[in-house]
Structure formats: structure tokens, C-alpha cells
Amino acid sequence: MKNLTKIKFKENGEFNHFPGNTVVANLYTKQDLMEVVDIIQSRYRELPFIDKFTLTPRNSIHMTVIELLCHENRETEFWSSNLPLDTPLQEIHDYFAKQLEIFPLLDEEIHMRVTEMGKQNILVEPADEASAKRLEEIRTYVSEKAGVRFPNHDRYQFHISIGYLRIPL
């Protein structure tokens, strides 16, 4: 997969328009987690090289459940087997909306636990067997309906992005 970081950001660090489709769990309403994110981001702001980072906005804190398609990454192994690589973005949105109109697996909570702090993210994993099973069911369902299965599907590292390193240190 190509490095999309330079495409995601303007030179001044602001986010560029970056269209695509991904299934996420929005976390910005989780008060306990947001307190931790605020502490981590405040420490980042104290770094002498903070200008090389863009911190994730508070209202965008999420955990990616499964990546789907990105307009800027039209490579076969990162694309739907059901759609041509040149499919217009709106057709992709419409296709996924139809395929995932029924999303029956969201009734139960999924509990995650922190495994470690990465350079730019909090690494997490399912906290119990039920959560691991539910998360895998969701990922399998979406993958099958969307025709998308990235090479790292079975070993995806769940994480919560605190920020993005735009310029190498």
C-alpha cells in the first residue's frame, strides 16, 4: 500500500479532502478515553518538533474496524473484487450503502483494551473472547458484502490515532 500521509495533509498540516470508505467506531463520546487522548495530545504539543505532526481532532477520534476503499489508493489488492478500479467515487459510495444497508452485528458492545502506546497511536485489542468474536464477525460480514479483503485482514492492528507524523523526525 502506498504511503498516503503526504496526500492526507496540506503543507501547513491541515487535513486535505481525502475521500473514501471505512467502517469506524467513533470514540469521541467515550469520556474516559477522551481524557487520556487529551493528556497524550497535550504532551505532544509540548514537543519541540510538534510542527512535524498533525494531531487528530477531538471530534474525529475513532478506531478503524475495517478499511474499505480510498480514492487515492486504487490498487487491486486494496480494492473491491466487485468493482472496477476506475469506478467513480459516488458509485462506490452508492454500492457500499446498498451492500451494507442491513448491518445486523452492531447490537452488542465490543470491549477493547490497550496493549501499548505506539509513536502516534494507542494500540488496542479485543478485551475478551466475546468482543474478539463480534469484531471478527463484523469484519467478515463487511468484507464479504463489500468484496474487500486487504492482505492484512487477519492480522490487522487495531489502533486509535492520536496524530500523524507528516514530516520525518
Language-model segments: residues:
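Histidine-dependent nucleotide/RNA phosphoesterase domain, centered on the 2H-phosphoesterase fold
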Residues: 1-169
